[in-house]
């Protein structure tokens, strides 16, 4: 299940998964998606490793900003993932 987190000024939607137990560790997937004329730009970051996958359309500069934001908000992603999203 994915839960909404925030919408940026450029229309980029940020959503996150519920807690995912894998190999004895709790993981959260953070997904970024922005509409374009041809579909969507998108990217995923898996916590706690901060591994980026499925990156399409975002620049390196945008990804660096997203990475900074994910790292600064990781505790909130875990909190909201554990309780079923922002209430």
Enumerate the predicted regions with their spans:
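A short, structured beta-strand/loop element
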Residues: 16-58
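Structured catalytic/translocation cores of nucleotide/phosphate-coupled proteins
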Residues: 4, 9, 40-43, 61, ...
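Short linear motifs in intrinsically disordered/low-complexity regions
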Residues: 10-11, 24, 68
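Negatively charged, low-complexity tracts enriched in Asp/Glu with abundant Ser/Thr
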Residues: 1-18
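Acidic, low-complexity intrinsically disordered segments
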Residues: 56-87
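Generic detector of leucine side chains in alpha-helical contexts
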Residues: 8, 19, 47, 63-65, ...
């Amino acid at each position: 299940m994915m839960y909404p987190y925030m919408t940026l000024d450029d229309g980029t939607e940020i959503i996150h998964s519920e807690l995912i137990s894998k190999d004895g560790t709790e993981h959260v997937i953070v997904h970024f998606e922005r509409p374009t004329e041809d579909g969507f730009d998108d990217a995923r970051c898996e916590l706690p490793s901060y591994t980026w996958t499925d990156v399409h359309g975002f620049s390196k500069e945008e990804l660096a900003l997203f990475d900074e934001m994910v790292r600064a908000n990781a505790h909130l992603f875990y909190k909201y993932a554990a309780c079923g999203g922002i209430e």
